[in-house]
Amino acid sequence: GTHILKPILPSHYENYQDAPANEHVTMLMARTIFKIPTALSALLYFENGDAVFVTKRFDVVDSGEYAGFRLSQSDFAQIAGLVPERDGEEYKYKGSYERIAELIRENVSAADVAVEVFFRIVLFNYLVCNGDAHAKNFSLQNSVENLDVYDLTPAYDLLNTSLHIPNEQSRTALDLFKDEDDFKTPFYEANGFYGTPDFMEFARRIGVVESRARRFIKQAIDAVPVMEEMLDKSFMSEKSKALYKENIRDRAKALGY
């Protein structure tokens, strides 16, 4: 198939009816406000009125000489060698974003560009309260023009998980740093959550230029009013719109400390 359909979540999640609209507006914000390459997607409705999130597969070539050809794609759990048999059921939550950035540098020829995009996605996920951006939600795939060249795939599975799991144990699915058991910034020690000092240290470690990292963080904080306008136009319930706005204000405040 060329598309993936994601209907409403099981009802034991909070605000479960809004899950398709949540993912739709979050992907839209990433693409239009933050200029992050994302999988193409849309929100459709079944005859009974239930919403369904539809995303276009980016591992299947849809036109030209190679139409129908499936590109080779590996997520970062696979690339890191994480398997449930050895690493347990929570294997995709092992590792760190810093380690993923290292693996990008090991496998992507245009690594500086790819690592910067990765930094922007991690920052965006933090802002929108996506607490499920684990190792399987980032992938590499080869190019149709050159099957030996790999690059970061468009971003996918972007949504505000706090709407559905309001008491998530952690703000991020993975630690920012490889040595988080032994290292914490003074900001994190004082506040118990990530802020700009943490993301600047993350940028330094993975090789994102300091001035550009600062600009991306400022853009994230400054984007909240435009994000709220887009949320107002979304297809979520009024309750979920209000919660989402509250969430991003809270994260922007954390970044703006």
Each language-model region and where it sits:
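Conserved ATP-binding subdomain of kinase catalytic cores across diverse folds
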Residues: G1-G88
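Conserved kinase catalytic-core segment
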Residues: Q17-F34, Y93-N167
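Residues within well-ordered alpha helices
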Residues: M29-A30, F202-I206, M230
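Short, surface-exposed acidic
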Residues: L40, I206-Q219
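A glycine-rich phosphate-binding loop feature that marks nucleotide/adenosyl-phosphate handling sites
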Residues: Y45-A51, N137-S143, A220
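Catalytic-core segments of enzymes that bind and process phosphorylated/nucleotide-bearing substrates
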Residues: D75-E98, N142-E210
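Regulatory N- and C-terminal appendages and interdomain linkers associated
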Residues: E106, V113, N146-L152, I221-Y257
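Short alpha-helical scaffolding segments that buttress acidic/His motifs in well-ordered protein cores
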Residues: F118-V122, I217, M230
